[in-house]
């Protein structure tokens, strides 16, 4: 078949869409007055002709750091905070669509957010848009520095925003499955969101207390929160067509389902295996990082986003006896021999070819950004899908020396799922 280039095609009129008649941001306030430490809940009632574009919806929060009794920080106080504050300040976010719970209950929302931010966004995004969400890159190999005046320049930059308990405002898209897909939420479907604040020792970083400078009792105080939902008014003819099709079928919204889980690697081991890490339909991709267990539970003096290698010398997955990756991760951090492992991560992320570059250098990856990625499903993970795999996954880790404390392995998995909505606008 002979093709013709667009600059020579004069006889076809441009396609004009008439389905979306109006587009705007709808401001939603919490259903109750915000109280320190209490969940922040939003209720969005479905309207028949208003479809919701969650992919372009934003959460805005205004907050400050102060003492638990409300006293403002004084000029000499130097209080650091976690990276990506818009998200790390919440332990979990519950989401309900059409009376169906579509999120898993856990306290790992900060880790999902930081994983997705570090792994998915190139430098151009991190240095611009993600600043609005509280992102400032921590200095590699300086994650243990909790004094904001120290060598971690990222921590120092963030600290300046909170001096004297000044109000700080962040805005960005929540890290929720349905907020990262392109289909609109149909009109008439109710949606509930519940943001659960994290405890202060997880969010706030401060130098260790001394006799001269005791540890202050601090809190994150949220003064306002708003949800800006991108709303699209749809033509009556399209609504009628949708409702007619609903009589014999359902709305189907495919999305990438992200699940978080943790494993505890005990003190005093050089080998760690875990059978049945995933069972049944296997995820398309898995990311793993190791964190000090005290940081995960919350500590003023430990950065929860320090992903250490702990002298790891072997890391791999067994899927029905098959090794993934075929050549397992076998870094030697004592001799700085880890470039192949770094490139394996880039390949699993899709940053090994083309113009997009990962923001993490090999040296940074080995010094606090040590995240490993496993691609389970062969082929592309975009619009064109390969068949999912089924079976079970075994995790194998080896360390050069015995672990000196408990380590938490944090895992993020990506799989495919579909949300269906029936004619009563209920999720099924």
Predicted feature residues:
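Short, low-complexity Pro/Thr/Gly
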Residues: 1-428
């Amino acid at each position: 078949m002979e093709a013709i280039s667009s600059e020579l095609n004069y006889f076809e009129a441009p396609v004009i869409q008439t389905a979306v008649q109006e587009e705007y941001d709808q401001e939603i306030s919490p259903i109750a007055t915000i109280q320190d430490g209490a969940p922040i809940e939003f209720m969005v009632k479905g309207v028949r002709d208003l479809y919701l574009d969650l992919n372009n919806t934003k959460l805005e929060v205004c907050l400050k750091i102060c003492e638990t009794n409300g006293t403002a920080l004084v000029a000499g106080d130097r209080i650091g905070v976690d990276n990506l504050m818009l998200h790390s300040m919440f332990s979990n976010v519950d989401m309900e669509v059409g009376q169906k719970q579509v999120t898993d209950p856990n306290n790992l929302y900060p880790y999902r957010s930081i994983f997705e931010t570090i792994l998915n966004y190139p430098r151009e995004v991190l240095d611009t848009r993600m600043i609005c969400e509280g992102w400032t890159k921590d200095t590699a190999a300086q994650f243990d520095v909790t004094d904001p005046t120290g060598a971690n320049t990222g921590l120092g930059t963030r600290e300046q925003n909170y001096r004297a308990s000044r109000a700080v405002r962040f805005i960005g898209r929540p890290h929720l499955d349905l907020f990262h897909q392109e289909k609109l939420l149909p009109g008439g479907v109710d949606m509930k969101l519940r943001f659960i604040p994290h405890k202060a020792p997880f969010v706030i970083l401060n130098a260790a207390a001394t006799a001269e400078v005791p540890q202050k009792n601090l809190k994150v105080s949220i003064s306002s929160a708003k949800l800006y939902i991108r709303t699209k008014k749809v033509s009556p003819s399209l609504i009628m067509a949708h409702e007619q099709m609903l009589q014999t079928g359902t709305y189907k919204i495919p999305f990438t389902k992200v699940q978080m889980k943790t494993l505890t690697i005990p003190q005093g081991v050089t080998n760690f295996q875990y059978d049945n890490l995933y069972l049944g339909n296997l995820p398309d991709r898995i990311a793993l990082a190791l964190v000090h267990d005290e940081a995960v539970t919350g500590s003023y003096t430990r950065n929860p986003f320090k992903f250490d290698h702990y002298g790891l010398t072997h890391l791999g997955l067994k899927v029905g006896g098959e090794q993934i990756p075929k050549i397992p991760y076998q870094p030697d951090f004592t001799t700085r021999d880890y470039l192949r492992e770094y490139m394996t991560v880039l390949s699993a992320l899709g940053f090994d070819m083309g113009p997009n570059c990962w923001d993490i250098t090999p040296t940074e990856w080995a010094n606090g950004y040590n995240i490993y990625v496993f691609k389970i499903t062969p082929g592309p993970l975009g619009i064109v899908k390969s068949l999912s795999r089924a079976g079970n996954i075994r995790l194998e880790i080896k360390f050069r020396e015995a672990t000196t404390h408990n380590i938490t392995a944090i895992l993020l998995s990506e799989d495919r799922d579909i949300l269906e909505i029936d004619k009563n606008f209920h999720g099924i």
